[in-house]
């Protein structure tokens, strides 16, 4: 290993540590896994919404892009994380297009209810071109 590779290893490790810290600080996290190819779902756009209980309108809270590990650190701050109904929209069609593939689902929306804001909620997305699955992780 030459000196530049050694230095790069420290920088990449630091970046992963920073991203993991941001993930741990956010009370809501996700992880996209491309189960068809056995790789993380990198570079996928995710839009986080919260339902307004009065108007029944979906309000966009944030937009992010998954990193090389398929994660989207810092989706929401603890201050903005209140009880309510949330929706994560994953732009799966654009993801598969970028890989030169077609898919059946142009996007995936996962709607869930938050009641206890002191807990951490993990909402992973496992997907292939023709199916997807999710669950509530910790």
Curated annotation (Swiss-Prot):
Binding site for substrate: 31, 71, 135
Entry keyword set: Hydrolase, Peroxisome, Purine metabolism
EC number: 3.5.2.17
GO cellular component terms listed in the entry, alphabetical order: peroxisome
A biological process from GO: urate catabolic process
Pfam families: Transthyretin
Biological pathway: Purine metabolism; urate degradation; (S)-allantoin from urate: step 2/3
Subcellular location: Peroxisome
Matches recorded under PROSITE patterns: TRANSTHYRETIN_1
Enzyme class: hydrolase
Coiled-coil segments on the chain, per record: none
Documented effect of changing residue 69 to A: Reduces activity by 50%
Catalysed transformations (reactions): 5-hydroxyisourate + H2O = 5-hydroxy-2-oxo-4-ureido-2,5-dihydro-1H-imidazole-5-carboxylate + H(+)
InterPro entries: Hydroxyisourate_hydrolase, Thyroxine_BS, Transthyretin/HIU_hydrolase, Transthyretin/HIU_hydrolase_d, Transthyretin/HIU_hydrolase_sf
Single GO molecular function: hydrolase activity, acting on carbon-nitrogen (but not peptide) bonds, in linear amides
PANTHER family cross-referenced by the UniProt entry: 5-HYDROXYISOURATE HYDROLASE, URICASE AND TRANSTHYRETIN-RELATED
Family assignment from sequence similarity: Belongs to the transthyretin family. 5-hydroxyisourate hydrolase subfamily.
Record's subunit section: Homotetramer.
Job of this protein: Catalyzes the hydrolysis of 5-hydroxyisourate (HIU) to 2-oxo-4-hydroxy-4-carboxy-5-ureidoimidazoline (OHCU).
Note: HIU hydrolysis also occurs spontaneously, but more slowly.
Protein name: 5-hydroxyisourate hydrolase
């Amino acid at each position: 290993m030459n000196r530049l590779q050694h230095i790069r290893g420290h920088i990449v490790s630091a970046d992963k540590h920073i991203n993991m810290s941001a993930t741990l600080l956010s009370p809501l996290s996700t992880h996209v896994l491309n189960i068809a190819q056995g790789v993380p779902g990198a570079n996928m756009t995710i839009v986080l919404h919260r339902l307004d209980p009065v108007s029944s309108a979906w309000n966009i809270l944030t937009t992010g892009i998954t990193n090389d590990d398929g994660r989207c650190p810092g989706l929401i701050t603890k201050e903005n994380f209140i009880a309510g109904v949330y929706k994560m929209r994953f732009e799966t069609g654009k993801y598969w297009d970028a890989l030169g593939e077609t898919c059946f689902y142009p996007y995936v929306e996962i709607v869930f209810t938050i009641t206890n804001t002191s807990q951490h909620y993990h909402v992973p997305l496992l997907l292939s071109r023709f199916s997807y699955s999710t669950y509530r992780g910790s």
